[in-house]
Amino acid sequence: MADLKDERGNPIHLTDAYGNPVQLSDEFGNPMHITGVASSAPQYKDSVTGNIAEYPTEAPPAGVAAGTGAAATTAAGVTTSETTTGQEHHGSLGEHLRRSGSSSSSSSEDDGQGGRRKKSIKDKIKDKLGGGKHKDEQTPTTATTTGPTTTTTTTGAAADQHHEKKGILEKIKEKLPGHHNHHP
């Protein structure tokens, strides 16, 4: 369980909305142990992003512009702050738990203007089904015909078949491994 204490040293018990005790766990269900002091008093700390001191939003010291930065203390003693660039910085516990910048399926793509934009679910599916290539990396294909063309008409069983338009589900099934084309 978490060994959290308030300013006076009294233990803080973590409970849910109904008053039941809560066991902290990570995203994999493993139990977590947190210790610290929960305080509502403003805490001043040095910025790790530069030479900017970060202050709580209530009262910045005299001579410091109000837009310099803001800090808020959570119950676990973990301080989160937001600098004027709009980037959020997580202190203490957040500094130890880093998140990888790489991902197997990207949720954003280049917007063509030097920035990033969030991909739609349709774009994500296209990326997955398109062999993993981005639309920038796909090689363009061109078809050219030279010489005279002839038209032939066929009669019999081949002419009686007509292609039905494939639905999205059929297209996805074709891309799955182990799928064999069983059309009559």
From Swiss-Prot:
Residues 87-98, 122-138, 160-177 have a biased composition (Basic and acidic residues). Residues 49-184 are annotated as: Disordered. GO terms for cellular component: cytosol. Keywords: Repeat. GO terms for molecular function: metal ion binding. This is Late embryogenesis abundant protein. Residues 60-86, 139-159 have a biased composition (Low complexity). Belongs to the plant dehydrin family. PROSITE patterns: DEHYDRIN_1 (PS00315), DEHYDRIN_2 (PS00823). The lineage of its organism: Eukaryota, Viridiplantae, Streptophyta, Embryophyta, Tracheophyta. GO terms for biological process: cold acclimation; response to abscisic acid; response to water deprivation. InterPro entries: Dehydrin (IPR000167), Dehydrin_CS (IPR030513).
